[in-house]
């Protein structure tokens, strides 16, 4: 039986962890290195860091953060945000990250996925997808530029394309559910989980342990990601894992 993973996410802006609702209204949530250590101790399976101030200045800060985190962590971690070329991947992986996550840059130039997978292996390449329900077409559309720009890609088509090019994992965020704490978008998660043969991480909407359970049972996700409920101590990784075990979910 496959072990399901619980992954805290740290959105990092100018060296601090922040959290918002539907990609807006950002609030400070602490120091990334301190939070990473706490989550490692609490039993997180992995961590995801997203540099949301992915300017040149943001990148320099992020490399420092990655190096500091790598020195303290025993669990794998993924870094994304502003990774536009192979050299960016090299910089982040050399700084100590285990995987890199690509989003906007991959939509603009899908070869980036291929280049990364060929150079580092698929296990290092995570395709992050921000998706939102589109009433007009009755499909989920892919968005770029931090959720600001709608693309023509339908979510499963883009996920399949990314996997074909070598992405080893999909980090799938529901923009409709992000920060709302009302549960993941199971329709979206299941759609993508069934469309691709690689692990799918459900993201956007975690408000409690039951939501995490449903990401696995209803959404068929391989991992569930959460931010604010852990940052603001509304629940702990330990509590989530013991709840999942009660319901027969295989966790570490």
UniProtKB/Swiss-Prot annotation:
Top-level EC class: lyase
Molecular function GO labels: imidazoleglycerol-phosphate synthase activity; lyase activity
GO biological process annotation, one example: L-histidine biosynthetic process
Pfam family, one: His_biosynth
Record keywords: Amino-acid biosynthesis, Cytoplasm, Histidine biosynthesis, Lyase
Active-site residues, record numbering mapped to chain: 11, 130
InterPro entries: Aldolase_TIM (IPR013785), His_biosynth (IPR006062), HisF (IPR004651), IGPS_HisA/HisF (IPR050064), RibuloseP-bd_barrel (IPR011060)
Protein's cellular compartments: Cytoplasm
Protein family according to the UniProt entry: Belongs to the HisA/HisF family.
PANTHER family noted in UniProt: IMIDAZOLE GLYCEROL PHOSPHATE SYNTHASE HISHF (PTHR21235:SF2), IMIDAZOLE GLYCEROL PHOSPHATE SYNTHASE SUBUNIT HISF/H IGP SYNTHASE SUBUNIT HISF/H (PTHR21235)
Functional description taken from the UniProt entry: IGPS catalyzes the conversion of PRFAR and glutamine to IGP, AICAR and glutamate. The HisF subunit catalyzes the cyclization activity that produces IGP and AICAR from PRFAR using the ammonia provided by the HisH subunit.
Name of the protein described by the UniProt record: Imidazole glycerol phosphate synthase subunit HisF
Native species: Bacillus subtilis (strain 168)
Gene responsible for this protein: hisF
